[in-house]
Amino acid sequence: MVPFLRILGIETSCDETAAAVVERDAEGHSNVLSDVVLSQLDEHSAYGGVVPEIAARAHVEALDELIEEALKRANVSLNDVDAIAATSGPGLIGGLLVGLMTGKAIARAAGKPLYAINHLEGHALTARLTDGLSFPYLMLLVSGGHTQLILVRGVGQYERWGTTIDDALGEAFDKTAKLLGLPYPGGPAVERMARDGNPDRFDFPRPLVGEARLDFSFSGLKTAVRQAAQDIAPLSDQDVADICASFQKAVSRTLKDRIGRGLQRFKTEFPATGEKPALVVAGGVAANLELRGTLQALCNKNGFRFIAPPLHLCTDNAVMIAWAGLERMATGAAPDTLDVQPRSRWPLDSNAETLIGFGKRGAKA
């Protein structure tokens, strides 16, 4: 039987500095003792996006205090944790270095094993923490750096069914917002404006819709937004709202096609065994209510459970990193050596082809 385990998690892959203490009991149930996150939004908003050097320096300044706070809120010391889990990639290399080196130092000083965690694996396994989900299931990761449809077979067993061939969806939202003069971060700004817009005013393209492969493309949609804005300039507030609403509609229809095909493939490869299949959504874009509604309706139509973890666990956090470490420990996986290095590009499926897409938040994996 797997023993009771407790891990300190560290996350620094992009623009959130985070630390958490999480437990896993012998039956696989989770208990989050602490969850501390410091956003760098104010540091980057003036630049309209994440500046890697600023992000790395902010991690250096904040991480030690956040770890102390996480331990304090959990009412434990380093002696009370069984291991350290730190994000090792993919992401911005400067931030990864800060978090992983800190994790190494703590592991060495406290005599604890170190688990270097793939950030994407943290997202992939979160639904097991929040909903006790059984394998296999599908996960849609939609963030500023990634847009991927992943089959989750088990801990360490992932198969990428679809990925972006250019911009990630969160990146497309941010760039659209910037084109329209909206504030950073762009996703929430576009969603707010879209509420008062006419989604049928502009017929924006829906890239790759109808194709058998499950990949995504959003750069053409971004270009269409730019052209529409130029054609009707100067823009009124209503123009901006209509563009945002039409953009969101195009994204929703694209996801409906791409994910719908993925759900059908899943049902073909994994015939019903009595338990309802599940689609999990994660990443910052998962906060968008229209996109959630589209995915919920799609799952209802296809007989799937739609699982969206709480928003604070959809975006970058250390709880998911600690949980991924706990899941690995529970399988008997060996810890990493202290010479493990961060990886800016680190696909979950090791046999995947190398991608050429490169997002503003780091290499796409």
UniProtKB/Swiss-Prot annotation:
Where along this sequence does the record place binding of substrate? 141-145, 174, 187, 288
Q: GO CC terms for this protein?
A: cytoplasm
Reaction(s) catalysed by this chain's protein = L-threonylcarbamoyladenylate + adenosine(37) in tRNA = N(6)-L-threonylcarbamoyladenosine(37) in tRNA + AMP + H(+)
Give the gene that encodes this protein: tsaD
For this UniProt entry, what is the primary localization, expressed as one broad class? cytoplasm
Residues that bind Fe cation: 119, 123, 316
Entry's PANTHER family? TRNA N6-ADENOSINE THREONYLCARBAMOYLTRANSFERASE, TRNA N6-ADENOSINE THREONYLCARBAMOYLTRANSFERASE, MITOCHONDRIAL
Against HAMAP family, the record matches this protein to: TsaD
Protein name per UniProt: tRNA N6-adenosine threonylcarbamoyltransferase
- Which organism was this protein described from? Rhizobium johnstonii (strain DSM 114642 / LMG 32736 / 3841) (Rhizobium leguminosarum bv. viciae)
